[in-house]
């Protein structure tokens, strides 16, 4: 079974609502329950932050963690669970810095994990499928930086 590395950073996808405030509290193991049968997962709980509060140093730490995960040749790809407020910026930084041809897929959620409309599980499943269905011949960018965002069926 392929190994997929999952880096958790917080965000709405890892949040529950307490007294009207969304707080990131869920670790990777909790978030991957619905997809546990799809792959072997290596979970790295890097940080637990609201992505609106991320600084450049946090984004750099995420990109560095991706690079470290690719140090293992057995890793099929990396999924980053991230908040939507700064996902674009962090994924762009990773795109600029990653040279490995294996996939990096960012995903998150619009609704907290305890909301009946929670989209996190579907987005995680999409991210896992994106990594597992990756074809280096068809999908790889020869210049490196194979970063994608998987969200809402896209």
Give short role names for the model-derived ranges.
Residues 1-154:
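Active-site histidine-anchored catalytic micro-motif
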């Amino acid at each position: 079974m392929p190994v997929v590395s999952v880096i958790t950073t917080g965000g709405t996808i890892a949040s529950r609502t307490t007294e009207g405030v969304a707080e990131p509290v869920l670790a990777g193991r909790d978030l991957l329950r619905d997809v546990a049968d799809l792959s072997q997962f290596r979970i790295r709980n890097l940080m637990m932050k609201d992505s609106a509060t991320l600084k450049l140093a946090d984004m750099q730490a995420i990109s560095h963690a991706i690079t470290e995960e690719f140090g293992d040749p057995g890793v099929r790809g990396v999924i980053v669970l991230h908040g939507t407020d700064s996902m674009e910026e962090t994924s762009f930084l990773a795109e600029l810095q990653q040279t490995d041809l294996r996939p990096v897929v960012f995903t998150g959620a619009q609704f907290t994990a305890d909301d009946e409309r929670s989209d996190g599980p579907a987005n995680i499943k999409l991210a896992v499928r994106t990594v597992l269905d990756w074809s280096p011949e068809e999908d790889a960018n020869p210049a490196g930086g194979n970063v994608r965002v998987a969200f809402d069926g896209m």
